[in-house]
A protein has these predicted regions:
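The serine-hydrolase catalytic nucleophile loop
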Residues: 6-19, 177
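Catalytic nucleophile-loop/oxyanion-hole region of alpha/beta-hydrolase
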Residues: 37-63
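Active-site nucleophile elbow and catalytic-triad environment of alpha/beta-hydrolase enzymes
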Residues: 135-155
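Catalytic histidine-centered segment of alpha/beta-hydrolase-like enzymes
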Residues: 199-211
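Conserved alpha/beta-hydrolase "acid-adjacent" motif
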Residues: 172-178, 204
Length: 223
């Protein structure tokens, strides 16, 4: 089951590459769009981390059977962890790419200057340029609601399934040290962090995709 990133949709490079890889193995695979993303209904500016996590849990509950391997990209890796905390008995393993746990703080709020923070508090919703295409729509409610789901301020993350985290050391959006912090808090002794020295945030190059599928294959075979 694949969980995409903030503003991404299920037609992205990693989602479609994983589906193709799974089809080739006869492996079941689920990809979906959060509300306000891609083909799903809803307004993006009204979405929250809690909403999108609940939607991922609903997909897990309604569209899958038995223990599942979750693959989460960026924000999707944060949501992947929230799903695992909510449904531990349904999770066989987690594979996170450029894990953006708590990104609403260090990637959104903390990068706004005082002028933009004042504007966001007045207008509730603002747009910011994105290096990946369409401008980001930033809603104050997204940032405020996300505080309920923060992970990096917790002493421990009681997740005991196998976990693999892959992070590019040239990630200009989410520092690779975020994945280190997540790894340190996980209860699972079977946790590994793979750093890609020249990897950037999207991890969508052919070499990145090969690393992704190889790592996922190893997790499936070790179950």
């Amino acid at each position: 089951m694949f969980l995409g990133g903030f503003t991404s949709d299920m037609t992205g490079i990693k989602a479609t590459a994983l589906e193709q890889w799974c089809r080739g193995r006869g492996q079941a695979f689920v990809r979906f769009d959060y509300s306000g993303h891609g083909a799903s209904s809803g307004r993006f500016a009204e979405g929250t981390i809690g909403d999108w996590a609940a939607e991922a849990i609903a997909v897990l509950d309604r569209l899958t059977e038995g223990p599942q391997l979750l693959v989460g990209s960026s924000m999707g890796a944060w949501l992947m962890l929230l799903v695992a905390l909510a449904r531990p008995e349904r999770i066989a393993g987690l594979l996170g790419l450029a894990c953006a746990a708590d990104f609403t703080d260090y990637l959104l709020w903390e990068r706004l200057d005082d002028r933009l923070r004042d504007r966001l508090q007045r207008e509730r919703v603002i747009t910011l340029p994105s290096p990946y295409g369409e401008p980001y729509i930033i809603a104050l409610n997204l940032i405020e609601e996300a505080k309920q789901h923060q992970l990096l301020n917790r002493a421990e993350l009681p997740i005991r399934c196998p976990v693999r985290l892959i992070h590019g050391m040239r990630d200009a959006d989410v520092p690779w040290r975020i994945s280190v912090q997540v790894m340190e808090k996980l209860s699972s002794p079977d946790t590994r962090l793979i750093l890609v020295k020249d990897g950037e945030h999207t991890l969508s190059r052919e070499s990145d995709l090969r690393l992704l599928t190889r790592t996922l294959g190893e997790m499936i075979e070790s179950r």
